[in-house]
Design a protein with these regions (language model features):
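Flexible glycan-contacting loops in extracellular carbohydrate-active proteins
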Residues: 194-238
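Short surface loop/edge beta-strand patches of beta-sandwich-type extracellular domains
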Residues: 14-23, 70-93, 154-160
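Short tryptophan-centered beta-strand motifs in secreted/extracellular beta-sheet-rich domains
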Residues: 97, 166-174, 183
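Short, aromatic/His-centered strand-loop micro-motif at the edge of beta-sheets
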Residues: 141-169
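Extracytoplasmic low-complexity segments
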Residues: 6-72, 256-261
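Extracellular, beta-strand-rich glycan-interacting domains
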Residues: 29-38, 94-103, 230-260
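Glycan-recognition/cleft segments
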Residues: 111-144, 200-202
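C-terminal motif of bacterial Sec signal peptides marking the signal peptidase cleavage site
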Residues: 2-4
């Protein structure tokens, strides 16, 4: 099993699920619960997940343990071969996770579906600077293949009551049928923006690995030939838990259900 390459030698006794040879059908493409100091994907599709050697774990996750980010830490999730043709034509997208962090003083990468030749990724979520001690300034960047090649879209979402000592659940949902992105905080929709004529998500030059807790250009080596590390861009130093990626539009009810646990 290739995943053993990424085995934590302090915790070698992993039980690997036996492959059934059947292609999964679940829209939950990746699930990282981070329990028992185990960084691996617990979804059915089997992303090959590794950190850069600096990942730590926090004991007090939302349930069990959590990922503890740091300025020199990040996670890479290599897309399994059975999904290599799915990622460029993903269509719809939901990224959902628990987060606990304090106010950022630099841009911090949270998630990227990389573009291997561009400065920015195909789909990026990151924190931008904001003056508030509690309100977070999220930015979402998209390169979509519409009638226009590499149709670039930006979403700026200022969401209240994010920073502090409490865990907060976030979900970023892109609906290709309505060209709309919606952000949920603790199960409630708090932000919506239409991206006219954006349509279903189609990506070019998709990088082999997704980035969690970093920008695509902040990894070593960079996930793109289009840029290397930037002084203004940092890795996410806070905590993450129960990180989920779906290739579907989760409904408000489904997101509320995840939040409620």
């Amino acid at each position: 099993c290739m995943q053993s390459c990424f085995q934590d030698m302090d915790h070698p006794a992993f039980d690997y699920p036996e492959s059934t040879g059947e292609v999964p059908t679940t829209p939950l493409k990746m699930y990282l619960p981070f329990d028992e100091e185990d960084i691996r994907d617990k979804g059915e599709w089997g992303f090959l997940v590794a950190d850069n050697g600096n990942a730590k774990f926090a004991e007090d996750g939302i349930a069990g343990m959590a990922y503890q980010g740091a300025e020199n830490a990040y996670i890479l999730a290599k897309t399994p071969s059975i999904l290599e043709n799915n990622m460029p034509t993903i269509g719809d997208l939901t990224v959902a996770f628990w987060m606990r962090t304090t106010k950022n003083t630099s841009a911090q990468g949270l998630f990227s579906i990389p573009n291997s030749i561009k400065f920015c990724g195909n789909f990026d979520i990151f924190l931008e600077n904001n003056n508030s001690e509690t309100q977070a300034f999220f930015k979402v960047h998209i390169f979509n293949q519409t009638a226009k090649e590499n149709d670039e879209r930006w979403v700026e979402a200022k969401i209240d009551d994010i920073f502090g000592s409490e865990w907060v659940h976030l979900a970023f949902v892109y609906d290709g049928n309505t060209s709309t992105i919606t952000v949920y905080r603790n199960g409630e929709g708090v932000f919506t923006k239409e991206l006219p004529d954006c349509g279903k998500l189609k990506f070019n030059n998709v990088g082999a690995s997704l980035a969690v807790g970093a920008f695509q250009f902040s990894t070593t080596p960079s996930l793109t030939s289009g840029a290397g590390a930037q002084t203004w861009a940092k890795n996410f130093p806070g905590q993450l838990d129960q990180f989920r990626l779906y290739d579907k539009v989760l409904t408000a009810t489904e997101i509320q259900s995840i939040y409620s646990g």
